[in-house]
Curated annotation (Swiss-Prot):
Residue spans of the WD repeats: 19-58, 118-157, 158-195, 309-348
Gene name as annotated: PAN2
Classification via InterPro entries: Exonuclease_RNaseT/DNA_pol3, PAN2, PAN2-PAN3_catalytic_subunit, PAN2_N, PAN2_UCH_dom, Papain-like_cys_pep_sf, RNaseH-like_sf, RNaseH_sf
Region (Linker): 351-484
Keywords from the UniProt entry: Cytoplasm, Exonuclease, Hydrolase, Metal-binding, mRNA processing, Nuclease, Repeat, WD repeat
Notes on how activity is controlled: Positively regulated by the regulatory subunit PAN3.
Protein name: PAN2-PAN3 deadenylation complex catalytic subunit PAN2
GO BP annotation list: mRNA processing; nuclear-transcribed mRNA poly(A) tail shortening
Residues in Exonuclease domain copies: 917-1091
Details of cofactor binding: Binds 2 metal cations per subunit in the catalytic exonuclease domain.
Length: 1124
């Protein structure tokens, strides 16, 4: 194998436009004709044929000219692989397989739609099934077989796992998996007969020759530390396997790192090995001392394109059928062709068939008119016309975007329902048709000039303030009732370089009622949680159970039942309600509730988990999921009450029914009682509505149907069925009557109507009533709109969850859920973190086609007031259980290996209002941040990383002998995947949070959270550094009067730079802290000492001068501690 070298090099995929240039992704020599196939990253296929030329070339002997060029993939998917066929060439891309003849005409295209196989995507490789050229085996996430003679269906093999490479032998398929494993698969028995584990990282290439398989790949590089990312290194060996004996043979060493390996097609003992850096080696596998080594020139011959290390690589190594040529590509769109010297052959195979040439039509003969400077253009005639030409417009006429008038978009739902026979056109929804609509130019549209989004807090100056006239985000009514006002829109949280803390939530809420953030998982539940929060009866009942203790810590609950937080839906709901009581208009998070919900097995089975902000749900699916969640919430809270405290929601939301079954034909007469927590509102049939209306009533009376008619029909049912016991001897009917016998203080009504049913209630102007009365007679409950006595119970509308449809109901990701809630005789709109007052007339106006009530809630009018915990009386509450502050409660019980670094509180040290405590928390990252990088290098934060509490330390802060002694030092148990332990910042090492190996004081999240919640309600003063971010990640709202944050004390707003705890300790305390990994006990104690120093400087009147000196010293030291 002497004398090999480069004989040709062409820029195969280069283009005159830099934008259109694309990389070579696949190469293949044709086995029928003298062609070399080349595929690029944009799905284009080219073929080249060798030709003799007299033009001087930089590489002698052979010139490649392009024979054909055509598109072979859908969109811009790259061509991954070629496969030769007698009648053409098969090309594989991400989601399709194309079969073209050699001129480029498409013969067959296989994709998920043509095969009716939704799993036919994410394809990676293909080959023929053993020795046939008609059965095509395609691999990716699954393994398929397609008959090219009958390409209308697929056959799936019994194989699981991602396949990245595939080849065939006489009897088997050789499957290369992405983890470095090679499987020998028998397509006849449909099973794997042997597996080889040659590489513990990735697989880069395999080749099959007879009964031998060769492979090369990567291995995992040992990590230098636990926090570093996994990396791979190229294996310096080529593995060889013998399929006759099903064992591996001695590997072939290749010190440069083997990236590609090919058997010589004519010399089975010769193997060609190549590295990505361009080193090629011909080696005899039976005599490995017989080696020929070459180095490819991967530099670019085009001087205009600089050569960089990112472009100098070798890829896509292939060998011709006669073994006389090899080809590969580099990073400059160059195709390299090699052969041995003195090779006069120009054929890639020994006996190539005739290469069909393109047909040329003779040129069309016509008399051309020569137009030059001498011949005027006006000599060429034009057709007769009367009107002015388009080019004849005034010189002062300009076309600008602001003056443009664009037509309205056609609603897709109109096109979908164009053949509907029931409601062919909804005038209420779309307005009158065939009208000349008035279009307003953009520059006259006032709404485009108004402000919808706030500035970041860091961008504001002292002159920025709220201005209702400059913002229309609170606009709830438009002149065009078919458009959705801004206050109902899907709100998006914007992130600056300072994260979510820089977003101005106060821009959207100027009330004392708190909104909920919507950038978390399962944020669709916000509107329903806000509705239940402002029901005094429901809220008071839920939060009073927080006084009691339920802290499961057994490993069965934590691991087997999938509840690592040791919490429940009931507890987390109570914490949310209490947090919203304390926040007084500040935004709140539902992260802990969402995590417990996501790990709830019942919620998973009912498909209530949503992690994409409902982007894949249409209007019907959103209505269904929020209705299911309403039932799930009440039933789960009821079960939690039974399991935890031996009580239930029966006194709050339980609706009682009597079901009577009787017959006149036999002696069946049964009466049963049942109950449910919610009501599924049913629309009466048309004939029932006509009975309710009465045929003799006037037109005005017919429009007075309301929700009470629907409630009465839904709760009082009557039907007849055949008696199964007596059907043969004496046929007769059974009468089944359901009657309402009890209504609770809170009535939760699910309104999951169809589109036609919603259209019907929009015709009733007073369908949603603000109040109604119930009467009890003969142990039955009936509804009345008005009352004339004191024997009835009065119910008032608390509010309802409303779906906002933007565009067609079939569109996904365009719709929103809001809630209208009546609080202290005033109505408010809650749209996640937007809260605003709204007129009562707007609440009861259901005539908008985009506005649909989904969950309606009524409550007794004589309900109690809202209850909340007060610091002065919290410790004296009779049901309070605060024993967790004075004892250990480890997850899985107390273990001997646990190392304690704290001293528990005693009853003599019981905290009370004003008790000073120092706190610091450490976190781990469960998910990395999501970034959007633009072509110009601009990075936008789409979603911040998800931090989870890992350690919490609380120290005694009052003056005394135990000042600075910790009494809480909890490590939070984690059973889920942790993306980054943030060891340099948190001090948490891998294994510290694992219940099977940790030596730390592991507790559940709810155990530690309850300790902080008790300290908060007891009135303790929290001292720390950067507490705003800590409390946000913990999901705990602490009022400002209970926070002493040293990051805020030692801060000059005009300089807009906050000082680190490490730097402040060095300047003020003359101590170096955080010299290694962070320790939360050390950080909390340092913050406590800084606070004491602040009090000392303030008392002697030197704080201001000291603060300015700190900043001056910081500028000289660049705010860094020397030698740190």
């Amino acid at each position: 194998m002497e004398g090999w070298g480069e004989i040709s090099r062409i820029a195969a995929t280069a283009s005159s436009s830099v934008i259109d240039n694309s990389k070579i992704t696949s190469l293949q020599f044709d086995n029928q004709q003298n062609l070399l196939w080349c595929g690029d990253s944009k799905g284009t296929t080219r073929s080249f044929t060798p030709q003799s030329t007299s033009i001087p070339m930089p590489y002698p002997a052979l010139h490649l000219s392009q024979y054909s060029k055509f598109k072979t993939s859908l969109g811009t998917s790259p061509v991954k692989q070629y496969l030769n066929h007698q009648k053409g060439i098969l090309s594989l891309s991400h989601n399709c397989v194309n079969f073209n003849n050699r001129r480029g005409l498409t013969q067959l295209s296989l994709n998920s739609e043509s095969l009716k196989e939704p799993g036919f995507n994410n394809l990676s490789c293909m080959t023929f099934n053993s020795n046939t050229n008609n059965d095509l085996v395609i691999a990716g996430d699954s393994l398929f077989k397609v008959d090219l003679l009958k390409p209308n269906m697929t056959t799936s093999f019994n194989h699981t796992g991602k396949v990245s490479m595939i080849d065939n032998t006489l009897n088997y398929l050789t499957l290369g998996k992405s983890n470095g494993e090679i499987e020998i698969f028998d397509p006849v028995s449909n099973q794997t007969v042997k597996s080889f584990y040659g590489h513990n990282g990735l697989l880069s290439d395999i080749d099959v020759q007879g009964n031998y398989v060769a492979s090369c790949g990567y291995s995992l590089r040992p990590r230098r530390n636990q926090a570093s990312q996994s990396s791979y290194m190229i294996d310096p060996l080529v593995n060889i396997y013998d399929l006759r004996m099903m064992r591996s043979l001695p590997p072939i060493p290749f010190s440069a790192g083997a990236s590609f390996v090919k058997f010589h097609p004519k010399l089975p003992n010769i193997m060609i090995i190549a590295s990505s850096l361009g080193q090629l080696q011909f080696v005899d596998i039976y005599d490995q001392s017989n080696v020929y080594l070459y180095q490819a020139d991967l530099s670019n011959v085009n001087a205009s394109t600089p050569t960089t290390s990112s472009n100098t690589y070798l890829a896509n190594l292939e060998v011709s059928g006669n073994g006389e040529f090899i080809t590969f590509s580099d990073g400059f769109q160059n195709l390299h062709l090699w052969s041995f010297k003195n090779n006069n052959s120009k054929n890639f195979i020994n006996f190539p068939s005739y290469l069909e040439q393109p047909d040329f039509s003779p040129p069309f003969q016509q008399n051309h008119i020569n137009v030059d400077d001498v011949v005027p253009l006006s000599s060429i005639g034009m057709p007769y016309y009367k009107d002015l030409l388009l080019s004849n417009y005034a010189s002062d006429l300009h076309f600008t975007k602001e003056l443009s008038k664009l037509p309205n978009h056609l609603d897709p739902e109109l096109l979908q329902n164009q053949y509907s026979q029931v409601l062919p056109y909804n005038t209420l929804k779309y307005g009158k048709r065939n009208l000349n609509k008035f279009y307003v130019p953009l520059q006259n549209n006032v709404s485009t000039k108004q402000k919808l989004f706030p500035k970041f807090i860091s961008e504001k100056n002292g002159h920025d303030s709220f201005d209702n006239e400059n913002s229309n985000i609170f606009e709830y009514k438009l002149s065009n009732k078919f458009e959705v006002p801004n206050c109902y829109s899907n709100l998006k949280i914007q992130y600056s370089k300072f994260g979510v803390e820089d977003f101005d939530f106060s821009f959207y809420n100027r009330t004392k009622y708190s909104g909920l953030e919507n950038h978390l998982d399962n944020s669709y539940i916000n509107s329903l949680l806000q509705l239940y929060k402002y029901s005094p009866v429901f809220q008071n009942f839920i939060i009073k159970h927080l006084l009691k203790e339920w802290l499961p810590n057994d490993l069965t609950t934590i691991i087997q039942n999938g509840n690592p937080q040791g919490s429940s839906i009931l507890n987390e709901l109570g914490y949310i309600f209490d947090m919203m009581n304390k926040s007084h208009g500040k935004n709140c998070k539902t992260s802990n509730f969402s995590n417990v919900l996501s790990q709830n097995q019942v919620a998973q089975m009912q498909e209530l988990i949503n992690k994409d902000d409902c982007k894949n749900l249409n209007a019907f699916e959103i209505r269904a999921i929020i209705g299911k969640f309403n039932k799930f919430l009440l039933s789960t809270c009821n079960n939690d009450l039974l399991n935890q405290f031996n009580t239930s929601l029966s006194e709050i939301t339980n609706i009682g029914y009597e079901i009577e079954i009787k017959s006149n034909g036999c002696n069946i007469n049964n009466v049963n009682y049942n109950s449910q927590l919610t009501v599924d509102l049913m629309s009466p049939p048309i004939n029932k509505l006509s009975i309710l209306i009465s045929a003799n009533s006037t037109s005005a009376t017919k429009k007075n149907l309301n929700i009470l008619n629907y409630l009465d029909y839904s709760m009082n049912q009557f039907k007849t069925i055949k008696c199964q016991q007596c059907n043969n001897s004496f046929p007769h009917l059974l009468e089944i009557r359901q009657s309402l016998v009890h209504l609770p203080p809170v009535i939760s009504i699910n309104v999951n109507f169809t589109g036609q049913e919603f259209n019907l209630i929009q015709n009733f102007p007073n369908w949603l009533v603000p109040e109604f009365y119930t009467y009890g007679m003969n142990n039955k409950v009936s509804f009345k709109l008005h009352s004339n006595d004191n024997l009835s119970n009065k119910y008032e509308l608390l509010g309802y969850v409303c779906e906002i449809n933007v565009g067609s109901e079939f569109l996904k990701g365009k719709h929103n859920l809001v809630s209208y809630i009546k609080i202290e005789s005033k109505w408010y709109l809650f749209n996640d973190f937007l809260v605003m007052p709204i007129p009562e007339s707007e609440v009861f106006d259901l005539s908008y086609h985009w506005k649909k009530p989904i969950i309606v809630m009524y409550q007794l009018a004589n309900h109690a007031d809202f209850g909340s915990f007060q610091q002065q009386s919290f410790a004296q509450l009779p049901d309070l259980n605060d024993s967790i502050l004075y004892r250990d409660h480890f997850a899985g019980g107390i273990r001997d290996s646990i190392k304690r670094e704290y001293e528990l509180l005693t009853k003599d040290e019981a905290p009370n209002a004003g008790t000073l405590i120092a706190i610091d928390a450490e976190f781990v990252a469960l998910n990395p941040e999501e970034l959007e990088v633009h072509y110009g290098g601009v990075r936008n934060l789409i979603k911040p990383r998800n931090l989870s509490l890992a350690r919490i330390s609380v120290l005694r802060g009052d003056n005394g002998p135990k000042q600075g002694v910790p009494f809480i030092d909890d490590y939070i148990i984690h059973t889920c995947f942790i993306d980054d332990y943030l060891t340099s910042f948190s001090g948490i090492e891998p294994g510290d949070l694992d219940p099977s190996s940790s030596t730390k004081t592991l507790t559940t999240l709810q155990t530690s959270y309850r300790k902080l919640w008790l300290l908060l309600n007891l009135g303790c003063i929290f001292v720390g550094h950067g507490l705003q971010n800590d409390f946000r990640c913990i999901n705990l709202h602490v009022p400002k009067n209970q926070i002493r944050d040293t990051a805020d004390f030692f801060y000059l707003p005009e300089l807009k730079r906050k000082l680190s705890l490490k730097f402040l300790a060095y300047i003020l305390l003359k101590e170096k802290v955080q010299t290694g990994n962070h320790d939360s006990i050390e950080d909390a104690n340092t913050a406590l000492l800084l606070y004491k120093k602040y009090l000392e400087l303030t008392a002697i009147g030197e704080f201001e001068s000291t603060l300015h000196r700190i900043y001056m010293d910081g500028q000289q030291l660049r705010f860094r501690v020397p030698d740190s």
